[in-house]
């Protein structure tokens, strides 16, 4: 019978470290290597740090500043069973501004924001947050990254954000 020996240029399987960003279907060099792929499913504003409503019944703009009266923190939320450095994967793939925790501290100032005459403004303090979904990957015998089961999800804050919306004042007359 025939005897098959491994090709001289075959590489041993290697551990690429805890976070190895990959794209399913793209070429990989070493079958058996593992990694992860991750996508942002949605990004939204979470305004749970505080809100203030201020009306300007004057004839000129009204500068408004508010103080944070209670510390509010947004922490990350990840699915169970993640056995690699998820934060590294997200920072490599998208942005280093994603963190595991961001806070507003007591005494911090929000503003100033100018409220136009005859307008009511609602200021909401919070965070820009993204929901992520990902999957573990493996380099297949065809030298392409493929899904390897092990899906995961995460929600992480990207940045603190103040949302300001205005409307016409109510006419109480």
Provide a role label for each language-model segment.
Residues 1-12:
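Secretory targeting and sorting signals
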Residues 62-114:
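Membrane-insertion modules used to breach or fuse lipid bilayers
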């Amino acid at each position: 019978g025939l005897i098959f020996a491994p090709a001289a240029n075959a590489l041993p399987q290697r551990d690429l470290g805890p976070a190895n960003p990959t794209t399913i279907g793209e070429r990989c060099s070493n079958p058996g290597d593992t990694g992860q792929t991750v996508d942002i499913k949605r990004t939204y504003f979470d305004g749970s740090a505080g809100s203030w409503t201020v009306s300007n019944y004057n004839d000129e703009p009204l500068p408004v500043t508010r103080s944070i009266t209670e510390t509010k923190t947004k922490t990350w939320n990840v699915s169970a069973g993640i056995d690699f450095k998820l934060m590294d994967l997200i920072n490599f793939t998208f942005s280093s501004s994603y963190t595991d925790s961001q806070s507003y501290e007591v005494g911090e100032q929000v503003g100033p924001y100018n409220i136009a005459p005859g307008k009511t403004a609602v200021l909401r303090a919070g965070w820009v947050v993204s929901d992520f979904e990902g999957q573990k990957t493996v380099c297949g015998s065809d030298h392409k990254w493929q899904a390897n089961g092990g899906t995961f999800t995460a929600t992480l804050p990207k940045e603190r954000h103040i949302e300001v919306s205005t409307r016409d004042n109510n006419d109480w007359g």
